[in-house]
Amino acid sequence: MTLALSGQKVLVFGLAKSGVAALRLLRQQGADVTALDARGEDALGAVAHEVKALGATRVSGPTPPGLLASQDLVVVSPGVPLALPEIQAARAAGVAVWGEVELAGRMLSGVPLFGITGTNGKSTTTALTGTLFASGDKRTFVGGNLGRPFSEAAMSPGDWDALVVELSSYQLEGIRTLRPRGAAILNLTPDHIDRYPSHAAYGEAKARIFQNQQAGDFVVVNADDADVLGLARAAKAPVYGFSLTGKPVADAPALAGLAVVEPGGFRLAFLGEHYTLTNRALRGAHNAQNAMAAALLARLGGVASGAVQAGLDGYPGLPHRLESVRVLDGVEWVNDSKATNVDSVLVALRAFSQGVWLIAGGKGKGAPYAPMVEAGQGKVKGVLTIGDDADTLARAYAGAAQVHACGTLAHAVARARELAERGDTVLLSPACASFDQFKNFEDRGDSFKRLVEAL
């Protein structure tokens, strides 16, 4: 679909990655674009030069009065709250306000879209779903909140047979007509409390993923999550569930089909199909949930069962999420740098039965570490502490496991090499932010991988 954007006055609010991608798309379509970002030229760096090269007008600093209301369309980046007074004033003046995802979706309305949201597991499920569709010989775009902005797909709409898109609550706030063929909500736990006044409001933002669906579409939900099932009651399309227990929570809406974990894998009971999960990149109960959601999206989206199994077997995993770096002298080294809070470490620990040397620490978030200590009973041999919160971690683990104060990641890796025995696992799962010693969790994970590869 081609929108009539040529010559239209369009303002892009926010010049992070999604905003810049929207700007490129709008200029490709011939729109007269103004780019608004509070940051000045020095802070924007190369982005400021690209805005100029694309022939757009850049406005920095406070929003000039009346600027938004003078536009034909305002496209808002996900990080910009729609509750801002200037955005509300533009809406009151009759100006259309879309998120970047809505803009791209309108230009891709002829391509089946499979959207994935939830608090945790979105990126893994999105990447895995993309792998399953590609395994079925579908020309598949994978992106959205993960990796490539959705607008990049709209630059060449004829290139795609399927669109697999991670959608954050922020992105879903900005949709109006977006209609996924398949919509998945993986889970719902408290998050983004700075943006939403309540957990219910956060859930309402997530539920927008299926607001435009019709009976010919489908919804995939976590049948073990009461909050998610509550949202699914409003769905117009058939609802399919996935479950670790095989017993959806009480008062669940009627399910059109269920995926259930069983020894060695899972089954899609309503299709009579069994899938094996032997891929190390998909270890752990949380990844069984991700795999079931991805398989439901793929099978209901037209991918053959054999291609789904091949995709599950061949999925390479995402960096920094229980990523197996190497096995050295019988010891596996695992990079889970994405685990920046206690809950994420609990998920990681469930993937191992014994012999874990845990590297943890960094900039703490104030949460108690007691749940980690309890979850590690009988499986964590020792903890190697790093970063600002090392002392707090050491106190939490005192008497429960060996504690080795290492300070730096390099020291922790070297000490773990001395301590770990054949059959053990050295797990970097920090439970903390990385900003005390690294640029971000990716930098921390990459540093860990370099250190391990150098052993």
Swiss-Prot record:
Pathway: Cell wall biogenesis; peptidoglycan biosynthesis. It is an enzyme of class 6 (ligase). It is found in: Cytoplasm. GO terms for molecular function: ATP binding; UDP-N-acetylmuramoylalanine-D-glutamate ligase activity. The keyword Cell inner membrane does not apply. InterPro entries: Mur-like_cat_sf, Mur_ligase_C, Mur_ligase_C_dom_sf, Mur_ligase_cen, MurD. Cell wall formation. Catalyzes the addition of glutamate to the nucleotide precursor UDP-N-acetylmuramoyl-L-alanine (UMA). Belongs to the MurCDEF family. This is UDP-N-acetylmuramoylalanine--D-glutamate ligase. It comes from Myxococcus xanthus (strain DK1622).
